[in-house]
Amino acid sequence: MTVRILAVCGNGQGSSMIMKMKVDQFLTQSNIDHTVNSCAVGEYKSELSGADIIIASTHMAGEITVTGNKYVVGVRNMLSPADFGPKLLKVIKEHFPQDVK
């Protein structure tokens, strides 16, 4: 199985696109089987079926609701692996250990 990440920002064109690339690089270097997509906060509900983890800024993460085996990771600096990396790895190792190589 591959853990599916969805990067979310206000309009889906700026921060989430860059965050998508940063998360992809980080997870590749961390040997995690993954896919990463991005969208605007207003579109995340239509993208939920293809995501296991939603990653967004802390203020936006509070607006995102998920159920079942889906998780939201709120980060202060969406572009810094030093900020999002440990939080994302914690969720992956706890809930998706089969994707850690």
Swiss-Prot record:
Enzyme Commission identifier(s): 2.7.1.194
Catalytic residues as annotated in Swiss-Prot or TrEMBL: 9
Swiss-Prot/TrEMBL keywords: Cytoplasm, Kinase, Phosphoprotein, Phosphotransferase system, Transferase, Transport
GO molecular function, one term: kinase activity
Top-rank lineage group of the source organism: Bacteria
Domain notes: The PTS EIIB type-2 domain is phosphorylated by phospho-EIIA on a cysteinyl residue. Then, it transfers the phosphoryl group to the sugar substrate concomitantly with the sugar uptake processed by the PTS EIIC type-2 domain.
Protein name (record): Ascorbate-specific PTS system EIIB component
Organism name: Shigella dysenteriae serotype 1 (strain Sd197)
Taxonomic classification: Bacteria, Pseudomonadati, Pseudomonadota, Gammaproteobacteria, Enterobacterales
Record gene name: ulaB
